[in-house]
């Protein structure tokens, strides 16, 4: 990758983050009256719904803390990180069991709790960045405590009817992959001592049960022993999810200087990019079938924003770690398609949901699932990766 291209991409990612995406959410997503963050926004940032997804109280707080700790000590970023943590402290925990809600109303009154504890994973990394920024020990302790709730609830969903009966028990890749990135974040922010053990356990689970070299696939849902169920749910692949998991594993390989982990992460990317790339219209398909049979999910051929964010990260990570030209080409391919179709030139930020041909399906900028996370994380990480590539190139010449 030549110097001019690196500098051009840094400008796209850095300026997109600091001058477009972050300002959009700072203008429209801060609830200065009731606290916390509002994410259900129309194309122009106007409010569509005042209910608050708890995932984004944690995710946006994490982003603001991450930027404060690692980009620039802007007081506004720290104050708004505190703003989000304060709302979570006051409204997002169920006092009956210590778990977090999934959805609250504008005032913070609970609406819904889910079986799986992903609100907790995002809150944990937010508390971690807050602790690092402020030096407040209670926040570091709370971050680890919430992480442990996340682990325990996902291993043993107390108080909830199991998702699957014993007729065909199954498990998804979501828990171990989110355990990896959450533990990595907390290792970095608060030096959490149990991080490596959970990362080891989670990577082992994924490579043993979900990673299938004989099929050249990463399976989303498997039996408890890694069996593949030849049914709709068992054959359904989620390329974006698997590619996101791939860069988590690459990142751990980089941290440990472990080439075997890097190799596994790159292999996951190769398989799932090949399966997920739409050869007719371009872009990453949301779901595909392991045997190339029809998929039951009616949104299977839509182009969501976040698989493209994760593939942009993963391909650039693979290029940094291997230097292989195919990953530079892969990154260029997905970057070009995404940046031609998702950005809104008039109002800023990205559309989230496109039809298969890349036309806009719905113009909103945020909802329960889309908010300030995948896109700004992609911009921030790719900015860093490109600076690392720049440095690597300079030392090799």
Predicted segment positions?
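Glycan-recognition and catalytic cores of secretory/periplasmic carbohydrate-active enzymes
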Residues: 1-397
């Amino acid at each position: 990758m030549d110097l001019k291209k690196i500098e051009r991409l840094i400008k796209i990612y850095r300026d997109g983050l600091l001058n477009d995406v972050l300002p959009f959410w700072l203008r429209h997503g801060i609830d200065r009256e009731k606290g916390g963050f509002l994410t259900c926004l129309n194309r122009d940032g106007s409010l569509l719904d005042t209910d608050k997804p708890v995932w984004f109280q944690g995710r946006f707080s994490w982003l603001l803390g991450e930027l404060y700790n690692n980009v620039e000590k802007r007081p506004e970023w720290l104050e708004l990180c505190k703003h989000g943590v304060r709302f979570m402290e006051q409204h997002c925990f169920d006092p009956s069991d210590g778990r977090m809600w999934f959805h609250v109303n504008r005032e913070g009154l609970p609406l819904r709790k889910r079986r799986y504890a992903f609100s907790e994973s995002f809150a944990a990394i937010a508390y971690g960045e807050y602790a690092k920024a402020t030096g407040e020990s209670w926040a570091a302790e709370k971050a680890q405590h919430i992480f442990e709730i996340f682990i325990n609830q996902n291993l043993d969903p107390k108080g909830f009817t199991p998702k699957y009966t014993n007729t065909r028990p199954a498990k998804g890749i979501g828990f171990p992959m989110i355990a990896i990135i959450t533990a990595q974040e907390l290792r970095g922010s608060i030096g959490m001592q149990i991080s490596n053990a959970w990362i080891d356990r989670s990577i082992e689970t994924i490579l043993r049960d979900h990673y299938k070299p004989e099929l050249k696939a990463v399976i989303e849902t498997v039996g408890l022993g890694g069996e593949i169920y030849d049914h709709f749910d068992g054959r359904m692949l989620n390329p974006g999810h698997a590619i996101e998991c791939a860069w988590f594993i690459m990142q751990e390989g980089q941290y440990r200087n472990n080439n075997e982990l890097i190799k596994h992460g790159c292999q996951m990317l190769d398989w799932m990019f090949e399966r997920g790339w739409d050869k007719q219209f371009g872009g990453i398909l949301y779901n595909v079938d392991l045997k190339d049979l029809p998929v039951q999910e009616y949104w299977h051929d839509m182009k969501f924003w976040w698989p493209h964010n994760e593939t942009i990260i993963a391909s650039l990570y693979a290029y940094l770690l291997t230097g292989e030209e195919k990953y530079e080409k892969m990154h260029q391919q997905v970057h070009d398609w995404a940046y031609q179709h998702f950005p809104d030139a008039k109002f800023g930020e990205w559309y989230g949901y496109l039809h298969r041909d890349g036309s806009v399906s719905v113009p909103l900028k945020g909802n329960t699932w889309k908010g300030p996370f995948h896109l700004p994380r992609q911009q921030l990480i790719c900015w860093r990766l490109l600076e690392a590539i720049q440095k690597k190139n300079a030392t090799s010449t």
